Amino acid sequence: MSEISTSAAPTEIKVGRHLFRWEPPDIGYVSYGGDLDGEAAAALSAESRKFTLGKPRVFLLVNMARVGQISKEARSVSAAGSKDLSIVGIAVVGAPGHVRLVVGLVSRAVELMQRTQDSPTRFFATEAEGRQWIAQRRQALDGP
C-alpha cells in the first residue's frame, strides 16, 4: 500500500492518496487526500517513523484541507504512532471545524503518550501561516 515516489525526493512517501515528506532538519509534512482508515494510518505512521524516530525534536505540519472521513481506528493508530517521538509542535492547515475537534482529541492522546505538555497544536488557514508558526516555535525553543 505504501510506495516511495520515484518522481519526488527520496524523503517523500505516498500511502494511497496520502503523503508524508521529511523536511530536514525537523519537519514531518503530512497531507491527507481523502478518507483515512486504520490501514492507511498504520502504513503512514510506520513509514514516517523511519524518519522521525530518534530525532531530538519533530514539528508536524499537517495539511487536512482534502481529508475525508477519519475512522476511529485511524485516530487510535495515529495517536499510538507518535509514541517515543519528540514532537514539539503540530501545525494543522486547512482543517474544517468538525475535523478540528477530531484533531484536538488525537493531539491530546499524543500528549498523554509522550507524557509532555509542551507539544502545542495550532490551526491555520494556509501552509505559509503554519510554517511561520513552526519557525517562531523553533526560535522560542532554541532561545536567544
Task: Label every PLM stretch briefly.
Residues 2-144:
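Amphipathic, Lys/Arg-enriched alpha-helical "gate/interface" segment within cytosolic domains
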